[in-house]
Amino acid sequence: VSEKGKNKIKKAVEELDYIPNQWIRNLYKKRTGIIGVMTPDIIHPYFSTLWNYLEAELDQYGYNVVICNTRGNQDKEREYLDTLERNLFDGLIVGSAFLSDEYYMNIEKPIISLDRIIPGIPLVTSDHHQGGILAGELFLEKGCKKVMCFSDPTRMELASADSARALIDVMEKHNREVIIESFQWEEVINYQLCMKRTRTLLDQYPDVDGIMALDLCAAAFLKTEKNKKILAYDGTYVTDFNYHSIDSIVQDAKKVAKESVNMLIKLINDQPLKKREVLVPVKYKKGDTL
């Protein structure tokens, strides 16, 4: 195009206030305009809340979102990662990671992890160490001597496991006992299975006087046993569905979404990250179960 022609086009663009089609922009930049968001299960209260915030944040950058629901299936997880490798996604935000570290480390595409600690992959997560300390201090304040806490059902290195470790440290310093139990993923997202497991555990540990569990499990304990101190961990809408409002350690899903999207956009645009790990503070929400 001649210089005269360029000037005519520029003038027409200015007069018409023309905004180039986003699809054309993406085509020019060799991008798809799509971000994959990988979740263990969209039915989980915290993840469904987080994904809503992620979608809103990504929309501000002109990105569409594809929810990649793995249900803990490694084959499905591998399929979504292959989709990223084939350039069908511009980037991936991972809330579910069951494949090996090596599998992720061999992918040279923009990835942000939301919990799993993977060498070389940037991490955005709640400050679970702070959450565990808060929980321990609350149980001590209420005079609890034996607390039951639920760990994540996977054996992977997860940032969220810090909450259990910090709780144990706080309680043991005061000669209090912490029992660690794990729910299977199906029990975490299925209320009936959760109820069945809670009854079994209460029969097994009748002298437990404090319980820290994910929101749905905490709600199940509340329905089964009202004489124990119950603290939910996540602090989603589930904690307000009962006759009693459940005391909660609340993860700031909105801030987690904002920080993870900001980091991912920088990776996509080949911009340097000031830090490769972001911890988002948690807070205590008072209810009437402690």
What is the role of each PLM region?
Residues 1-31:
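N-terminal helix-turn-helix DNA-binding module of bacterial transcription factors
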Residues 58-69, 164, 168-193:
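Short beta-strand elements in bilobed, periplasmic/extracellular small-molecule ligand-binding domains
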Residues 124-149, 191-199, 250-270:
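Hydrophobic alpha-helical segments within soluble ligand-binding/sensing domains
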Residues 199, 204-212, 217-290:
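Flexible loop/turn connectors
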